[in-house]
Amino acid sequence: MPKIKTVRGAAKRFKKTGKGGFKHKHANLRHILTKKATKRKRHLRPKAMVSKGDLGLIIACLPYA
Protein backbone atom coordinates (compact mmCIF):
# COMPACT_ATOMS: atom_id res chain seq x y z
CA MET A 1 0.00 0.00 0.00
CA PRO A 2 1.55 3.34 -0.99
CA LYS A 3 1.94 6.22 1.41
CA ILE A 4 -0.73 8.93 1.40
CA LYS A 5 0.53 12.33 0.31
CA THR A 6 0.01 15.31 2.59
CA VAL A 7 -1.51 18.39 0.93
CA ARG A 8 1.40 20.80 1.44
CA GLY A 9 -0.75 23.95 1.34
CA ALA A 10 -2.90 22.58 4.16
CA ALA A 11 0.17 21.55 6.16
CA LYS A 12 1.36 25.18 6.13
CA ARG A 13 -2.04 26.60 7.14
CA PHE A 14 -3.32 24.24 9.85
CA LYS A 15 -1.77 23.02 13.11
CA LYS A 16 -3.16 20.17 15.18
CA THR A 17 -4.11 20.89 18.80
CA GLY A 18 -3.71 18.59 21.77
CA LYS A 19 -7.37 17.52 21.73
CA GLY A 20 -7.31 16.58 18.05
CA GLY A 21 -8.75 19.76 16.56
CA PHE A 22 -7.04 22.07 14.10
CA LYS A 23 -6.30 25.77 14.45
CA HIS A 24 -5.75 28.29 11.66
CA LYS A 25 -5.16 31.98 11.10
CA HIS A 26 -8.09 34.23 10.16
CA ALA A 27 -8.34 35.64 6.65
CA ASN A 28 -8.58 39.39 5.81
CA LEU A 29 -5.56 40.57 7.81
CA ARG A 30 -2.85 40.80 5.14
CA HIS A 31 -3.38 44.06 3.27
CA ILE A 32 -5.89 46.92 2.73
CA LEU A 33 -6.14 47.31 6.50
CA THR A 34 -6.77 51.07 6.64
CA LYS A 35 -10.48 50.78 5.83
CA LYS A 36 -11.06 47.97 8.32
CA ALA A 37 -12.16 48.89 11.82
CA THR A 38 -9.72 48.40 14.71
CA LYS A 39 -12.23 46.12 16.45
CA ARG A 40 -12.51 43.95 13.34
CA LYS A 41 -8.73 43.64 13.04
CA ARG A 42 -8.39 42.85 16.75
CA HIS A 43 -10.97 40.06 16.51
CA LEU A 44 -9.12 38.58 13.51
CA ARG A 45 -5.81 38.37 15.40
CA PRO A 46 -6.22 35.20 17.51
CA LYS A 47 -6.15 31.78 15.90
CA ALA A 48 -9.49 30.13 15.09
CA MET A 49 -10.54 26.50 15.27
CA VAL A 50 -11.67 24.53 12.23
CA SER A 51 -15.44 23.95 12.36
CA LYS A 52 -16.91 20.49 12.85
CA GLY A 53 -18.22 20.37 9.28
CA ASP A 54 -14.79 21.07 7.76
CA LEU A 55 -12.83 18.81 10.10
CA GLY A 56 -13.11 15.73 7.87
CA LEU A 57 -11.66 17.58 4.89
CA ILE A 58 -8.68 18.79 6.92
CA ILE A 59 -8.04 15.32 8.32
CA ALA A 60 -8.07 13.92 4.77
CA CYS A 61 -5.55 16.58 3.67
CA LEU A 62 -3.25 15.92 6.64
CA PRO A 63 -3.15 12.12 7.07
CA TYR A 64 -0.06 12.15 9.35
CA ALA A 65 -0.94 15.16 11.53
UniProtKB/Swiss-Prot annotation:
PROSITE patterns: RIBOSOMAL_L35 (PS00936). InterPro entries: Ribosomal_bL35, Ribosomal_bL35-like, Ribosomal_bL35_CS, Ribosomal_bL35_sf. Transmembrane segments: none annotated. GO terms for cellular component: cytosolic large ribosomal subunit. One of its GO terms (biological process) is translation. It comes from the Bacteria. Keywords: Ribonucleoprotein, Ribosomal protein. GO terms for molecular function: structural constituent of ribosome. Pfam families: Ribosomal_L35p. SUPFAM superfamilies: L35p-like. Residues 10-22 have a biased composition (Basic residues). Residues 1-22 are annotated as: Disordered. Belongs to the bacterial ribosomal protein bL35 family. This is Large ribosomal subunit protein bL35. It comes from Escherichia coli O127:H6 (strain E2348/69 / EPEC). The gene is rpmI.
